[in-house]
């Protein structure tokens, strides 16, 4: 009885490092699981290479447009020296907005479509397969064969409901990402060369940090809702509500867990962008390949995080109820 109590307490103390370590153990302990996740990641890899090429070309075009030197109001002379003040050559955001031509807008729409339809659907399929199989491997001592994984990777009856939850997650994720983009673009287009540059830089940095923190904290909760849909059969708004309940008091762990995977993905993307990866196919392949290798680990970690948050909450509830019983008995 005492050993069971100690075991329960140990489970309650899973921190970010413990979750990551346990996810690595689950992932690499079964070679068939590695092979299966690799095979299911191939379609995601292909479409993501295509998406990254478009995205990085778009980032280069955006950077070139935003950072173009300003033109004189009187003639076509271009001035790149901003050390003097002359109202004839003042900063005009409307000129930057005019540079976003039709081709740029079409490329932006196409990139958004690729992200929200084929890429997200393939990420969803990869996620639910990884979550379902990782949960089985987590709860069973027996290893699964590759044949067993192929025959029934997940419960098909939960597919539709899980997809509904993923649509909610997509909407919430996209709106917060657009919020971050809105802050950055406002700073570069309207505020960067204003008289109160330093003040606006501090305000925008603080706003960006706040929204990013919210995004990472809530990403853990949104990912938890998808895990709950796949494993528990709770969908949509109900899944989000349940995940909010179970993640209460665990936001710090969720924040750091999501920060690790967020930093990994963006570090790869920015590294590839700075070396001109969109012009050299090999760099894009390496970037996407490394991302797809770590992506299953993210969902295994989310599955463990959900189990741990649930155990903590249920244990706390049981302790509160037993405390009430003792108080009433006395």
Give a label for each model feature.
Residues 2-11, 18, 22, 43-92, ...:
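Juxtamembrane transition segments at transmembrane-helix termini in multipass membrane proteins
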């Amino acid at each position: 009885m005492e050993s069971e109590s100690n075991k329960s307490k140990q489970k309650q103390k899973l921190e970010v490092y413990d979750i990551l370590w346990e996810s690595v153990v689950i992932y690499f302990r079964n070679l068939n699981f590695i092979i299966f996740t690799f095979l299911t990641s191939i379609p995601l890899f292909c479409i993501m290479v295509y998406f990254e090429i478009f995205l990085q070309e778009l980032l280069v075009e955006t950077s070139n447009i935003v950072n173009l030197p300003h033109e004189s109001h009187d003639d076509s002379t271009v001035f790149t020296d901003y050390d003097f003040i002359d109202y004839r050559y003042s900063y005009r955001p409307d000129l930057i907005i005019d540079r976003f031509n039709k081709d740029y807008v079409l490329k932006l729409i196409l990139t958004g479509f690729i992200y929200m339809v084929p890429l997200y659907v393939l990420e969803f399929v990869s996620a639910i397969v990884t979550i379902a199989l990782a949960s089985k491997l987590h709860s069973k001592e027996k290893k699964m064969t590759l044949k067993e994984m192929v025959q029934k990777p997940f419960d098909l009856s939960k597919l539709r409901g899980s997809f509904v939850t993923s649509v909610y997650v997509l909407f919430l994720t996209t709106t917060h990402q657009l919020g971050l983009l809105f802050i950055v673009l406002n700073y570069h287009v309207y505020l960067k060369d204003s008289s109160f540059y330093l003040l606006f830089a501090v305000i925008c940095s603080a706003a960006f940090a706040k929204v990013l923190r919210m995004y990472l904290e809530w990403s853990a909760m949104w990912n938890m809702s998808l895990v709950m849909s796949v494993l528990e059969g709770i969908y949509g708004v109900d899944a989000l509500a349940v995940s909010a309940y179970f993640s209460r008091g665990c936001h710090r762990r969720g924040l750091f867990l999501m920060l690790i995977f967020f930093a990994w993905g963006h570090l790869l993307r920015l590294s590839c962008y700075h070396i001109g990866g969109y012009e050299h196919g090999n760099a894009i392949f390496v970037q996407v390949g490394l991302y797809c290798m770590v992506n299953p680990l993210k969902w295994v970690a989310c599955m463990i995080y959900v189990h741990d948050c649930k155990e903590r909450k249920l244990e706390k509830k049981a302790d509160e109820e037993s405390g009430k019983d003792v108080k009433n008995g006395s």
